């Protein structure tokens, strides 16, 4: 299979596939006599795992670790589960931070009259000027 076939099947771009190869995140493909990369089902599995791991929030390094676990016949599902639950905890923390930012912005918006005057508690609060406090 060539890189364009793999790109179509995995939903990755050829550029992304080459990038993952350069970073050592996938098994290096064999080269044909003409120098073209030749991919196997193993490559499809690794690249699909990388794409899907990235989609659910794993960073590049973590995704590579999952590929290593995928290729390790001695892996323990407990390791994969632990990493997944750690990622869930990270995402939950990020959600809490986003909710806090949302609440702050809503409080600022509620404090602003939103009329034609120049007085804007949002700008004043964000700039630290004039000691206006929202909410």
Curated annotation (Swiss-Prot):
Residues 1-69 form the HTH merR-type domain. Gene3D superfamilies: 1.10.1660.10. PANTHER family: HTH-TYPE TRANSCRIPTIONAL REGULATOR CUER (PTHR30204:SF16), REDOX-CYCLING DRUG-SENSING TRANSCRIPTIONAL ACTIVATOR SOXR (PTHR30204). This is HTH-type transcriptional regulator CueR. Cu(+) binds at residues 112, 120. CDD domains: HTH_CueR. SMART domains: HTH_MERR (SM00422). GO terms for molecular function: copper ion binding; DNA binding; DNA-binding transcription factor activity. The keyword Metal-binding applies. Residues 4-23 bind DNA. GO terms for cellular component: cytoplasm. The gene is cueR. Homodimer. One of its GO terms (biological process) is positive regulation of DNA-templated transcription. It comes from the Bacteria. It is found in: Cytoplasm. Keywords: Activator, Copper, Cytoplasm, DNA-binding, Metal-binding, Transcription, Transcription regulation. It contains a N-terminal DNA binding region and a C-terminal metal binding region. Regulates the transcription of the copA and cueO genes. It detects cytoplasmic copper stress and activates transcription in response to increasing copper concentrations.
């Amino acid at each position: 299979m060539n890189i364009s076939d793999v790109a179509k099947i995995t939903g990755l771009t050829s550029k992304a596939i080459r990038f993952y190869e350069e970073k050592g995140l996938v098994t290096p493909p064999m080269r044909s006599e003409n120098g073209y990369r030749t991919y196997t089902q193993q490559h499809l599995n690794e690249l699909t795992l990388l794409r899907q791991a990235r989609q659910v929030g794993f960073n590049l390094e973590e995704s590579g670790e999952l590929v290593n676990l995928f290729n390790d016949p001695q892996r323990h599902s407990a390791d994969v589960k632990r990493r997944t639950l750690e990622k869930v905890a990270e995402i939950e923390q990020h959600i809490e931070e986003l909710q806090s930012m949302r609440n702050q912005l809503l409080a600022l918006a509620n404090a602003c009259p939103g009329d034609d005057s120049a007085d804007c508690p949002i700008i004043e609060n964000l700039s630290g000027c004039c000691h206006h406090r929202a909410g």
